[in-house]
Amino acid sequence: MRGIAYMKIIDITRELFSAEVFPGDPRPEANRIMSISNDAVCNLTSVSMCVHNATHIDAPFHFIDIGYGVDAIDLEKCYGKALVVECNDDSIDSGFITSKVPIGVKRLLVKGRATFTADGAEESVKRGMVLVGVENQSVAVAHDCQSAHKVLLESEVVILEGLKLDAVGEGEYTLCAFPLKMRDLDGSPCRAVLIQE
């Protein structure tokens, strides 16, 4: 039909209970409190989890003791044009950013298991990015989990971790990935989607 734009929504969120768990973090658990099958009026479930399980957003407080919590994140950073690029190396360093990411990109999602080095994070900040996302459960390289986190969070860059980008091609999309409103917490699960027009 003329005048109606085609729009496809791509879910890039990992299922909470089956997703990889970062070493040392608790696994999420669901507890059925009430059940219709046991003559209750409804089904009711409580969930116990780490706020960094599955697909989630890091707040500055995660690595900065005086940083703000996830409820204070600027939501405008979590919605808008985003570039998906693939990295076949182990790390996302400044060389990768300068060679693969055009100037002006504000939201960068990296496909693959790569994580950011400190200089890759610094180059992202220098370019004015407001959000970076990875498929790994941590944005930072394993041998130095603090540096990239601190560089990004001190500059109020939103960190989106645990994405599912295997079925997503490289290119530009509209990203929508909002944290839950939980006061002063260091992170939050989120439902992340890409909109392809």
Show the residue positions of the predicted features:
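Active-/binding-site microenvironments in catalytic and ligand-binding cores
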Residues: R2-E197
